[in-house]
Every structure is written in C-alpha cells, then in structure tokens.
Amino acid sequence: MHLTVTFNPAGDQTLRFEEPLAPDRVSRASSARFDAAGKGVNVAQFLTVLSTDAVATGVLGGFTGAFIRERLAATGVSAAFVESDGTTRLNTTAVADGTEYKLNHDGSAVDPETVDAVVDVVRERTPDTVVVSGSLPPGVTTAAVDAIAAAGDWDTVVDMEGDALRTLNERYSLCKPNRAELARATGADVSTVEGCARAATAFRKTGFDRVLASLGGDGVVLSTGSTALHAGALDVDVAGTVGAGDALLSGALAAWADGADDRTALRTGVAVATLLVGQVGTAPPDLDGLDALRERVSVRELSN
C-alpha cells in the first residue's frame, strides 16, 4: 500500500479567461473548476485511478479541508487526515491569453502535536511506500519528513522544494525534483538533458536510491546509480501543467508496484502526465488511450 503525506494540501481553483488579465479592472472567468489538491493528495488520487492501493494522510482544516475530504470520499480515495485548527489553503491558477498565473498561499501554521499525530498515522498504517510531497507549512520542518522515513521499514519517496531536499538527513528510496528544484538542490547546470542527468546522478549520492527529475517539455530523467535513462515528452496540446509532476510520479510508482522495469515505469509516468496536461485542473484524467500513449514514449540510456 502507498501512503501519501501532504502537510500542506490545498483546494485548487482553476479560472479560465477569454481576455488577457489587466490591472485595475474586473476580469470575469469564462469557466471555473475546483479540485482537491496538494501534491500528495494528487498522487493518492492518481494512484487510485491507476488501481494501485493508496491512502492519503496529512493535515486538513476549515472549509477547504472539508471540501477536500468530501471530494476524496466522492472519488473513492481512502483518507486518514489529521484535523487542524487552521484553514487549509486555497490556491488559484488563472489561465489567460495562453499564460498560466499561479497564486499560492503559504498555508496555515501547524503545531508540533499535529505533526506528531501525522507520524503516528503513518506508523499505524504500516505502508509499503510512503510518499511525502509538497511544500511545508509554517511550523513544519524537514525534521518531520526525516521522522517519517525513520519511523518504520518502508520505502520513502520525497517530492519537495530544492532547498528542503538539501536538509534531509535520512536515506530515501526516491526523490522527484523538477528541473528548477534540481538546480537549486545541486547548483549544477541543468540547461541540457545531459546536464540534468549528471546533476541527478550526483544528487542521488547525497541520500537517495533513485532520482526522478521532471524536465517539462524535455521529458524526464531517471538516475538509479547503475544507469541514467531519459524518456522524451510527447507532443500534445497542453491545456494546463498543474499536477503534471504528480501524474508522472504516480504513473511510475504504479508501474513499479506492478513489477515493471524502469523503462516501462518511465513510459507509464510520461503517458499519465500527458493525459493530465491535456485537461484543465488537477483531477485524475480519463485513462482511455493510456496504453497507446505509453507505446509512443521513447526511452534511451544516457552516460551516467
């Protein structure tokens, strides 16, 4: 079972505008959608759609927390969140004139007792894999992430900001930075796919068994120590990019859980991410066409 931990989940609202945004005037959206989100929440939803056993935990509070609970229950996602006195944040993505504007809140402060309660949930569930992902709200440090990794005999996956990744002290089975996070974590030149592969391989040696780096339109790189693989992105119309990295990670994790090799896991991750970016919002995509997309993804070995 995969247990996702999201200390800073969010209600996501996505607004589309037919006209460019401009200051000092009211801009009226032509459409709006609302999703339960936060990186770990996204991963739990995607894994569930991919028929991989998953439970979402973390911290929820207020009206947005209630919305996330309701939405997860309605979509069949198992959840075991800890209630907080604060209000879960509401993030906004505005899409106008071909541009995405992402407006995120830092999140409400979380007290030490609530953090300890989340760690207790992880212990009680005894998962095979724990996925800790997303930003950390005020009051939560990477010490909490290390505590989760050290609390039991499970694989721990992290998907966090680059600065946070550098302060982790435990050993992790997988790290999933994007290109900017990989650059912040390593200080390396990541302007090319090959540069990203070298940076991922170097970063792996700091405490990660594998590094899965998402590169946007350049695809994804996986460094395992013995090899480095690159999977190219597919050329499709992009409606939105929010949640693409979570979809990539979920597809790869689901494939590995089914016993797939690394190449198949990369193909699956890219295919799931491709389906997601073809729609607006972070709700799990319809998986029709997944197999056909997976067959189109090319994977090559890079110099490690």
Residue ranges and their predicted role:
Residues 19, 48-129, 293-304:
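Conserved N-terminal subdomain of the carbohydrate kinase-like
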Residues 108-111, 136-140, 164-166, 183-184, ...:
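Short, small-residue-enriched loops and turns at beta-alpha junctions
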Residues 1-57:
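Glycine-rich phosphate/adenosyl-contacting loop at the front of the ribokinase-like
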Residues 102-104, 127-135, 159-160, 176-181:
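Short beta-strands and strand-loop turn motifs
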Residues 146-226:
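Conserved phosphate/ATP/ADP-binding segment of small-molecule kinases
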Residues 206-210, 215-217, 232-300:
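Conserved post-catalytic alpha-helical subdomain immediately downstream of the catalytic base
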Residues 47, 178, 245:
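Short, conserved phosphate/pyrophosphate- and ester-handling motifs at nucleotide-, phospho-/glycolipid
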Residues 2, 52-54, 79, 156, ...:
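Hydrophobic anchor at the start of a short beta-strand
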